[in-house]
Swiss-Prot record:
Organism lineage string: Eukaryota, Viridiplantae, Streptophyta, Embryophyta, Tracheophyta
Alphabetized UniProt keyword annotations: Membrane, Mitochondrion, Mitochondrion inner membrane, Repeat, Transmembrane, Transmembrane helix, Transport
The name this protein goes by in its record: Probable mitochondrial adenine nucleotide transporter BTL1
GO cellular component terms, A-Z: mitochondrial inner membrane
Compartment(s) where it occurs, according to its Swiss-Prot or TrEMBL record: Mitochondrion inner membrane
Cited InterPro entries: Mit_carrier, Mitochondrial_sb/sol_carrier, Mt_carrier_dom_sf
GO biological process: transmembrane transport
SUPFAM superfamilies to which the protein is assigned, alphabetical: Mitochondrial carrier (SSF103506)
Primary localisation category: mitochondrion
UniProt keyword Ligase, yes or no: no
Keyword Transmembrane helix among record annotations: yes
């Protein structure tokens, strides 16, 4: 039984009461973890989540169809086997059978899902964010910031949201998915050393550690930046100009296919020498003939094969990039239309 004795505002309790109060206090001090289900559900209801998923689905469907062209393209770029598309095709079939055309496709499918999800999702998100920022800053364009005798207007209207979004998309997807690109190239170029994904991962790790999965990251970023920027910029500008000239609000599926293919062709042609140098750097380590940097790789190609050596495999690349770019946009827009139409329902 507790005895309460008032003394200068204090409450005195016996041992039993203290023990009981301590027990109650202990119960009340149990850790309470926040409920993350609501923000997770909100995310999967968001436009961004649906755009990321649309990109993943579009990439997977496109890659499954075009894997043989990717195999031939990679072999020609790195200088393996025949110098012609038909010759390279027959060489692969004779040595490895028809399944050789899908060499590395396992890793291709694993790679393309996060790559396209991150790339297309990032492009859409950054484009909207940049456009919104420009609209907000336009309202205060007349305002000037003065620092001593120097004054300037905080305007960013001269910056293209599409170009920034394209560059951001390429950088983000490359940083996250580069190890998968390394694995794909090893499986494609040296199937005798890396016959499967399960063997390639431990062999690369034993030889070079974690750094082995990021071999050639610098050159990859250098090559990806102009390609990604040009690709998204060209597609968006062609789409906008075409819709304006035809007084249309949106492209039809065949029009997406054509404009996507043209954007891929333009971007690939501009950035192809950097792609050749990047592939030589990445695969050169396997032969013990790795140039020290991208400039050295380009110089080596020009010295051995002439300037046209920088475009070796360009035809195969266009044969792969053009349909890939066009089909990807068709699938992406189709999935986006489907998923955004049910915007009130969570994806999971």
């Amino acid at each position: 039984m507790a005895m309460v004795v008032p003394k200068e505002g204090l409450v005195v309790m016996d041992k039993e009461s203290v023990s009981s109060a301590s027990s109650d206090s202990h119960l009340r001090l149990q850790p309470h973890f926040p409920d993350f289900t609501i923000p997770v559900k909100d995310f999967f209801k968001s436009r961004e989540a649906r755009e990321f998923l649309s990109g993943a689905l579009a990439g997977a469907m496109t890659k499954a169809v075009l894997a043989p062209l990717e195999t031939i393209r990679t072999r020609m770029i790195v200088g393996v086997g025949s110098r012609s598309i038909p010759g390279s095709f027959l060489e692969v079939v004779q040595k490895q059978g028809w399944q050789g055309l899908w060499a590395g496709n396992e890793i291709n499918m694993i790679r393309i899902i996060p790559t396209q999800a991150i790339e297309l999702g990032t492009f859409e998100w950054v484009k909207r964010a940049m456009t919104s920022a420009q609209v907000k800053l336009k309202k205060i364009e007349d305002a000037k910031i003065e620092i001593g005798d120097f004054s300037f207007s905080p305007s960013i209207s001269w910056i293209s949201p599409v170009a920034v979004a394209g560059a951001s998309a390429g950088i983000a997807s490359t940083l996250v998915c580069h190890p998968l690109e390394v694995l794909k190239d090893r499986l494609t170029v040296s199937p005798e050393i890396y016959p499967s994904l399960s063997l390639a991962i431990p062999r690369i790790f034993r030889a070079d550690g974690i750094r082995g999965f990021y071999a050639g990251l610098g050159p990859t970023l250098v090559g990806m930046l102009p390609y990604s920027t040009c690709y998204y910029f060209m597609y968006d500008k062609m789409k906008t100009s075409y819709c304006k000239s035809k007084n249309k609000k949106a492209l039809s599926r065949p029009e997406m296919l054509v404009l996507g293919a043209l954007a891929g062709l333009t971007a690939s042609t501009i950035s192809f020498p950097l792609e050749v140098a990047r592939k030589r750097l990445m695969v050169g380590a396997l032969k013990g003939e790795c140039p020290p940097n991208m400039a050295a790789a380009i110089a080596e190609v020009v010295k051995k094969e002439g300037v046209m050596g920088l475009y070796r495999g360009w035809g195969a690349s266009c044969l792969k990039v053009m349909p890939s770019s066009g089909i990807t946009w068709v699938f992406y827009e189709a999935w986006k239309d489907i998923l955004l139409a049910a915007n009130t329902k969570p994806l999971i």
